[in-house]
Amino acid sequence: WGQAPDGSRYLAKRQEIGEIPAGWNVPVLMYHAVGDEIWGYSDLFVSAAGMEAQLQYLQENGYETIWFSDLSHIEEYEKPVILTFDDGYDDNYTVLYPLLEQYQVKATIFVIGNAMGSPHKMTREQVYELAASGLVSIQSHTYTHGNLSAMDEAALRQEMELSNAALAAATGQIPYVLCYPEGKYSYLTMDIAKEYYSFALRMDGWTYQTGMDPYQVPRSFVSRRITLPDFLWFVNPSGKTN
């Protein structure tokens, strides 16, 4: 069960994922913070103007932003792209969310289960609002953002179960996508993840092609230094392969 900010309770549900057609190129882009106030590693912060320019490019050039659940009907999209944001920073709500609304763009945000409400992170109420917006899919970045490659089975299960419980309580949806913290995972991590999720994401690689291992989905890192010409390389190719 989850509880909304107004105190009402609801039954959390898991997203059902159908069979995914093979042979489609789907760029998966990896972001973190969005904004001009830099308080940490600068490459993690894409400027507000840079983010808007990228969204504008996608819109003007016929790209369609999708969620991972949309992959089961990928044939409906000519130029699909998935935007992902790691860690659940508060600027995802204050800076990114207004841009998503302005351009009607979908995004997936990976929230750390025990970090909601901590400094520089979104509050539970903000996570709830984003999840209810129709533009944002809230997914798992584990419970503590620990090193999954160093954990045994019991610790891995605890990370995933506590994360899922926290996010289900906040959003009413049980996560179906896992983002490996810092891209660290092992064969054991993947084996356990298959029991809880339909997809799991890396922090490196290039374009994801449907039919690849869904527990090693590659992503392109969009840093603050990325120019618009660089960005074009990240989103091509997109669509049906030959």
Regions found by a protein language model. Name each.
Residues 14-84, 89-91, 129, 133, ...:
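C-terminal active-site subregion of NodB/CE4 polysaccharide deacetylases
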Residues 33, 137-145:
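Histidine-centered catalytic micro-motifs
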Residues 83, 111-116, 145-152:
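Surface-exposed cleft-lining segments at the edges of enzyme active sites
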Residues 104-124, 129:
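A short, conserved beta-to-alpha structural element at the edge of catalytic cores
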Residues 94-95, 103, 134:
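Acidic/His-rich structured neighborhood in mature extracellular/periplasmic domains
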Residues 2-20:
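Boundary regions of SH3-family modules and the immediately adjacent low-complexity/disordered segments
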